[in-house]
Regions:
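Active-site histidine-anchored catalytic micro-motif
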Residues: 7-234, 238-303
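Short, Lys/Arg-enriched N-terminal segments with co-localized hydrophobic residues
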Residues: 1-6
């Protein structure tokens, strides 16, 4: 946006902690909170831009389903070619990585900037980072430093980082922090809101067309998701399952030695179920990873 033009943004409010209030001992969504967010932002930074605001649904993000994500994708995509310089989506932290990835793959990397903004606490809490995260998103759009989907987030005792939506990793248990894969965030702001690109970040141009979202269902009945753990009990498989998404240990490994594991992967193959493992980076050279081909396990790329 040039200096003589007024930036125009679209705010899409969806709920989450950033749109919630502490009622007694519980956090619950508050339909008036989106406007409280903008009011608090205005008090601290001023609003020198035009904006529209819509609210397709209000939900704590842990309750999101495929249908919720589909509704958000439809809402965002229907506004990409309007007169906005950027879109800001407020969202809960619990499923932030799912929604940012979904939007990233649906929209691609060649649209107006779409920034997701969350808060670790309700915005009136003294430790809340929601206003700072919003400041990062607005400043990022104002500077015109990227296209596609991003997440603006400030970890405790850190600066605001801008993450590519498809690179964000889930927050660890008991933590308010978010990171990108290999900690290669897109860029960062200093305390004066000057932006610096991360020299270690790299990405290719889109090799495929954006993914369709119209077939996202309430539940993913065809996909079975598993996480590796010691003494793992493998579930029974049925004909409804078409894909298995298996999370690996941190070094990209999973049990490939036990008879139980071998029998499970063999049964999946015989049923025509494709098995994909996440977290196994290219070049991982453990003995167990060498058996992936024998067990018909395919490694997914990082993003």
């Amino acid at each position: 946006t040039s200096r003589c033009e007024i930036m125009k943004l679209l705010f899409i409010f969806t709920g989450g902690t950033i749109g919630s209030t502490l009622n007694g001992e519980y956090i619950s969504t508050d339909s008036s909170k989106p406007y409280k967010l903008l009011d608090e932002y205005n008090k601290k930074y001023g609003i020198d831009f035009e904006y529209d605001a819509i609210q397709p649904y209000t939900e704590l993000s842990e309750n999101n389903t495929g249908s919720t994500i589909r509704a958000l994708c439809e809402c965002v995509c229907s506004n990409l070619t309007k007169e906005y310089d950027g879109i800001i989506v407020t969202h809960g932290t619990d499923t932030l990585q799912y929604t940012s990835a979904a939007l990233g793959y649906v929209i691609g990397n060649d649209s107006i900037p779409v920034c997701l903004v969350s808060s670790n606490y309700p915005i009136e809490h003294p430790k809340a980072n929601g206003i700072e995260n919003l400041r990062g998103a607005i400043r990022f759009i104002e500077l015109g430093n990227g296209r596609g989907v991003f997440v603006s987030y400030k970890n405790p005792d850190d600066t605001i980082k801008i993450h590519r939506g498809t690179r964000l990793i889930a927050s660890q248990a008991y933590s308010d922090s978010f990171y990108s894969i290999y900690d290669t965030y897109y860029g960062s702001f200093d305390d004066k809101y000057n932006f610096t690109f991360n020299p270690d970040f790299s990405e290719s141009t889109d090799q495929a067309t954006p993914l369709p979202y119209s077939k996202l269902n309430e539940r993913s009945n065809e996909i079975l998701r598993l996480e590796s753990y010691v003494g793992m009990a493998y579930p029974e498989l049925n004909a409804d399952t078409r894909y298995i998404l298996l999370g690996s240990y941190h070094s990209g490994t999973t049990d490939t030695k036990s008879d139980t594991a071998k029998e499970f992967f063999k049964r999946a193959y015989n049923l025509g179920i494709k098995v994909y493992i996440t977290g196994a980076s290219r070049g991982a050279d453990y003995e167990s990873t060498k058996l992936f081909d024998d067990l018909h396990i395919s490694s997914l790329p990082e993003a």
